């Protein structure tokens, strides 16, 4: 229905615990694929003076706009949540579909798809869900894997960011006390012990600025200066890959990587900040941040604006935004270019084509946070991130290290050269500073925790020397990796040109291939399995004439699969991602049974077929089923053994156990029981799922 509807907080809690208990999953994420840290491994990093248990996070995008998305990201091992960008224009019409992951990644999304206030509430709900789940003790969470940070994101121009709407959002993120208390009261009675939790109310004091492609550099500088002074925020500027310049972007992208058919329009370079302009505002804003005692950094990088040369998005969209695998090469070159100018003076956040293979490389460069979007939209969804840690662990084990700083120092074998560089750059080689360098060198040779060794030295500058060493290694690692990544075939067109396989059949309401790919690729958890028993159901067709009602035909509905695929409309924004990976044509989000979360949404989105199950409080009456087939509405309600079934041209009653001999009522034409039987199946199967929980 292309509009996201936030779910009641109590229902989210009920479902979270019920599903974990009965199905060993949370929001369709199997518990066996959770990543909860590993004893003996310390992935923690520093982000604006605070500790996060890992540098990994979801990028500002589809994985961070609803409460359940944030929890799902956390279950996959993400610990720095870059929340989806909000802006004053929060009622945009976004083209559908809006995500194309057939090969690399393209999108035509902008910012949040919720109202600003809704976004704020979803972020608070997501954080509270994480705290409740942690406090429950139901997960075997490693001791050093519980620290999570939230990074807000706003856009896109100064006027919008200075508006009351956005100001209230920022203030709400800095002090969410009232919202936390609101949702504290909604924690279900059976989980009342969690009402006593000391929930985090200062959700964030960090912000990543997202600007329009083409935002003037002076506007960027004014925005950050405003956020520094008005809101006392640690800030990061998300910069565009066009900073590399027209010649270098096209050389890398079109020639080296081979994406010849993809064209970055000249306007993208002409309208965006140039490298020289970016250097200027980074230097000035860095000084301002230092004066104010705030953190400041940059992020590489934003998506790459390209001409819409494909037929996936509406032709009205003249440009689209590229993400995913090839963007990684551009992003790493930008990191190198930036560090050649600024060294390790400013922290760098990174989001460009991160996956299980290169996450460990990004960690080795000392990038924080390292955020991912496109890869988590592929088969497996949020569970893909556990493989990131598998590769990182493998490399750490080979190096004999257990913490991130030690891993950075040893990852590419640049530590000895870095020591020589800092020794030749001003260390007193005859004094205690030299002793500190020697101690670090011995630790490099014999093993041990480098920071502890530095801290144990009598030389007061030992820790400073360690920091210089670590920074120098980051710079050398960047040079090493940029050379490697530019020549790796995995980023080329040849390796990224095959779309997911299609089998040539079209989806129907029931009995698809049930490959389950559509369930995890939905970042909102809109698609799910519906347990309807296999078998054949008799379908009666009645006619009412002068002699009364009679059966005129008998047909059957046969279900051959062990379960069916369905869609929860309130969580579905019709992005189209599930259609990309479904082997059949048509789109699960369009053709599979669609369930609405309320009668209001069922009625509002009347252009979509689907079902709404209205719960009742009495045992004497069954829930009422509202449905729409081919745009026509039907209703089934039961009291005792009596069924009331109505449609566009009939309103009948009958005994549930013997409809053929008890049917009565009015009808203008024959009445088939096909839709009735389907509605009964939907009622029984949906009410048995963990999704059907009251708040």
Segment roles from a protein language model:
Residues 25-39, 246-344, 379-393, 397:
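Glycine/Thr-rich beta-alpha phosphate-binding loop at enzyme active sites
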């Amino acid at each position: 229905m292309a509009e996201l509807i936030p779910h009641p907080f109590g229902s989210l809690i009920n479902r979270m615990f019920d599903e974990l208990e009965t199905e060993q999953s949370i929001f369709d994420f199997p518990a066996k694929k959770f990543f909860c840290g590993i004893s003996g491994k310390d992935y923690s990093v520093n982000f604006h003076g605070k500790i996060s248990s890992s540098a990994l996070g979801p990028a500002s995008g589809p994985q961070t706009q609803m409460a359940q998305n944030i929890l799902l990201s956390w279950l996959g091992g993400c610990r720095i949540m870059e929340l989806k960008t909000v802006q004053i224009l929060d009622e945009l019409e976004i083209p559908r579909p809006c995500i194309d992951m057939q090969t690399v990644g393209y999108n035509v999304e902008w910012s949040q798809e919720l109202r600003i206030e809704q976004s704020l509430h979803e972020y608070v709900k997501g954080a509270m869900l994480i705290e409740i789940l942690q406090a429950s003790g139901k997960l075997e969470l490693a001791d050093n894997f519980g620290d999570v940070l939230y990074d807000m994101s706003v856009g896109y121009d100064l006027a919008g960011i200075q508006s009351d709407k956005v100001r209230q959002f920022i203030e709400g993120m800095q002090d969410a006390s009232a919202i936390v208390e609101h949702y504290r009261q909604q924690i279900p009675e059976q989980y009342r012990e969690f009402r006593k939790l000391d929930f985090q109310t200062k959700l964030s004091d960090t912000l990543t600025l997202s600007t329009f492609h083409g935002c003037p550099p002076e506007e960027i500088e004014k925005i950050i200066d405003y956020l520094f002074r008005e809101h006392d925020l640690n800030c990061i500027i998300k910069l565009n890959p066009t900073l590399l310049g027209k010649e270098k972007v096209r050389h890398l992208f079109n020639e080296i990587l081979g994406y010849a058919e993809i064209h970055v329009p000249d306007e993208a370079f002409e309208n965006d900040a140039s490298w020289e302009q970016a250097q200027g505002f980074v230097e000035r804003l860095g000084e301002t941040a230092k004066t104010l005692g705030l953190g400041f950094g940059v992020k590489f990088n934003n998506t790459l604006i390209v001409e819409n040369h494909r037929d996936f998005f509406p032709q009205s969209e003249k440009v689209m935004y590229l993400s995913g695998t090839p963007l990684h090469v551009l992003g790493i070159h930008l990191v190198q270019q930036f560090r050649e100018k600024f060294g390790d003076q400013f922290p760098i956040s990174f989001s460009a084509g991160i996956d299980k293979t290169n996450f460990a490389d990004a960690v080795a460069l000392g990038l924080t946070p390292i955020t991912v979007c496109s890869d988590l939209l592929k088969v497996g969804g949020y569970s893909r991130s556990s493989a990131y840690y598998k590769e990182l662990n493998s490399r750490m084990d080979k190096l004999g290290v257990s913490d991130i700083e030690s891993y950075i120092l040893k990852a590419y074998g640049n530590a000895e050269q870095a020591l020589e560089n800092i020794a030749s750059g001003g260390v007193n080689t005859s004094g205690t500073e030299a002793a500190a360098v020697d101690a670090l060198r011995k630790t490099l040779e014999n093993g041990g925790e480098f920071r502890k060794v530095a801290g144990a030295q009598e030389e007061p500058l030992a820790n400073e020397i360690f920091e210089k060493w670590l920074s120098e290694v980051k710079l050398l690692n960047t040079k090493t990796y940029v050379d490697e990544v530019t020549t790796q075939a995995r980023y080329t067109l040849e390796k990224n040109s095959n779309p997911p396989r299609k089998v040539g059949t079209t989806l129907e309401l029931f009995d698809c291939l049930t490959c389950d790919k559509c369930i995890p690729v939905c970042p909102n958890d809109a698609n799910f399995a519906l347990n309807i028993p296999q078998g054949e159901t008799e379908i009666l067709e009645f006619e009412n004439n002068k002699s009364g009602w009679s059966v005129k035909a008998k047909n059957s509905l046969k279900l051959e699969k062990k379960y069916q695929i369905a869609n929860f409309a309130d969580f579905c924004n019709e992005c189209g991602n599930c259609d990309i990976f479904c082997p059949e044509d048509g789109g699960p989000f369009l053709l599979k049974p669609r369930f609405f979360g309320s009668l209001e949404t069922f009625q509002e989105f009347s252009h979509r077929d689907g079902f709404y199950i209205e719960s009742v409080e009495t045992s004497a009456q069954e829930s009422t089923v509202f449905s729409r087939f081919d745009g026509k509405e039907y209703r089934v309600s039961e009291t005792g053994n009596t069924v009331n079934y109505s449609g566009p041209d009939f309103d009948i009653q009958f005994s549930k156990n013997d409809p053929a001999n008890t049917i009565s009522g009015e009808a203008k034409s024959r009445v088939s029981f096909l839709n009735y039987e389907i509605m009964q199946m939907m009622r029984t199967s949906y009410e048995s799922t963990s999704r059907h929980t009251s708040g």
